[in-house]
Amino acid sequence: MNDTKNHLDKALETWLAGAQLRAQRLRHKRYTFGKQWSDKVEMSDGRVCDEHTAMRIMGYNPATNNLIRRLLKSIIGYYRSSIAANRLSDDVNNLPEIDARTLEEFLISGCAIQRVTYERRRGGLARWVDIVSPARFFINSVTDLRGDDVEILGQIRDMSPNEVVMRFSMGDRRRADALRNHFAKLEAAGNCRSTATGASVNDYISFLDAPKGMCRIIESWELETVEQYLCHDPMSGDIFYRNGDAANELENENKSRSNDGKPLIEFRWDISTMWHCRFMSPDGSLLHEEYSDAHPYVFRFYPLIDGEIHSFVEDVIQQQRNVNRLLTLNDRILSTAAKGVLLFPENQYARDMSIEEAAANWAAPDGVVLYRAQPGMPGPQQVVSSPGDLGVNRMLDLQLRLIEDVSGVNGALKGQAASAGMSASLYDSQHQHAVSSLSDIFGAFSTFIEARNQML
């Protein structure tokens, strides 16, 4: 196994450059799945904690009404029923499900990434499509929507020891034993633990350390320049490339053709680009390498204006935060309002009934409370106060409408029943308006799917 430390360092540098994107995606994912009080804040005493802890310290009970998840379900449901139903499908990859989950990732992070390979798996020899998490993907800074400015990309992968041996032993028993020993040493030096079932495996992933019992593999594709000969065969009309060391082979072929009176192959030296793939272990050992005309990844970043990535979820996070704060404020107001407080004058306690018995009988059906009435003084009274109209409900309605306006997902797209008096034409118009608002996202994702299908 050769050493490729320089190429591993280049992959690591590219991975570190994507730290901001991964942190942004993690925040959006948390908001999507309900962890909406996890942003870090600084307390007045200088302590740093998440918003949930800060609100509890201040006496609030943080409330959450997850509207973002509902929006995504509506969009994905529309995609499944109206768009994906007419798409290419196969029995091997279950593309409808893969594409739905990729769309969900696209809405959350603004990134849609898949890997298409032709290989043998448990399902047989086929062209396989795999979802690649942006948390495991690395790529140089790109600004071209078509990906023509990509120079390095790849992913970090976790494989079982058996899979590593199967993929990289190349039919050599000694190499298989060397691979087992190599990764056994790496596992002994690591300190990663297993991930609980149902928990995220990518939230705090590192570049070099694999989960317990797994082997970390870094797959890196670099665009390199290579010397080649551009050839033209007059006999067949084919134009093709030969390796840079094929000059003698071409000359010998032409000598043979000259003796037979056949047209000679025309060739000239040229420089071209090819993708150099390397599978590396965390210590820089090269497990396998190959050259290819194209890399196996298909990706789409949205909207990629000046290279920036912004997702659908990012647009509605602020409205979601406002809704949560209003719900928390309303809960605080209601919890601090007097609700059935009993005012019992101290000088009216009955000798034969304690204050505890009086409180219990007051709340009991058909209860009897004894007290000593005082001339000119009111008896025990129950106080119920109303918090009053502070405008919280109106502000909450405003934020809910703003979420519809910002996201473009209205009641018609959600499948909600039409309100009383609404005509069918108006309801259909609202549905079409929602679809038009999301057409840019659907269009961007459709170009991604088309590019993927061309690789199948």
Outline where the language-model segments fall.
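Extended, helix-rich architectural segments
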Residues: 1-270, 274-275, 282, 387-398
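Long amphipathic alpha-helical segments
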Residues: 58-83, 87-92, 118, 273-309, ...
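Short coil/turn segments at secondary-structure boundaries
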Residues: 97-106, 116-120, 334-346, 413-420
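Core catalytic machinery and nucleic-acid-binding channels of phosphodiester-processing enzymes
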Residues: 319
